[in-house]
Amino acid sequence: MKKTLLLNSVLSELIASLGHGDMVVIGDAGLPIPPETRRIDLALCRGIPPLLETVRVIASEMQVEKALIATETGQRSPHIRDGLGQLLPNTPFEEVSHEQLKALCRQARAVVRTGEYTPYANVILVAGVVF
């Protein structure tokens, strides 16, 4: 049995396979996921699991070089933006429009769907390297 925080085997495999610059999207329950993009659906019901908790666990094993969020996140859901900043304190953030974020989902290695019901509660984590 694994000793680290992340127990989900699908997420563990995804993180282990990431290369420098690969993107993983962690999204709210309503984020549209392109059919060609791998979907890892963790949503159980409204609010479970929450986005920030999901980011916390994924970031515990993933080397994150930068994070992208929608400009609308800070405007409509500042507590999500603030929470992401606390979880990823040494990570640079870039803001893009919500439409650009949705378009970037097509280039992501996977979209992780959470049960989050907060508007614009989505983040793209860009993989870094540990050396």
Curated annotation (Swiss-Prot):
It catalyses: beta-D-ribopyranose = beta-D-ribofuranose. Its EC number is 5.4.99.62. Keywords: Carbohydrate metabolism, Cytoplasm, Isomerase. Substrate binds at residues 28, 98, 120-122. The active site is at 20 (proton donor). The keyword Secreted does not apply. It is an enzyme of class 5 (isomerase). GO terms for biological process: D-ribose catabolic process. One of its GO terms (molecular function) is monosaccharide binding. Homodecamer. Belongs to the RbsD / FucU family. RbsD subfamily. This is D-ribose pyranase. The lineage of its organism: Bacteria, Bacillati, Chloroflexota, Chloroflexia, Chloroflexales. The gene is rbsD.
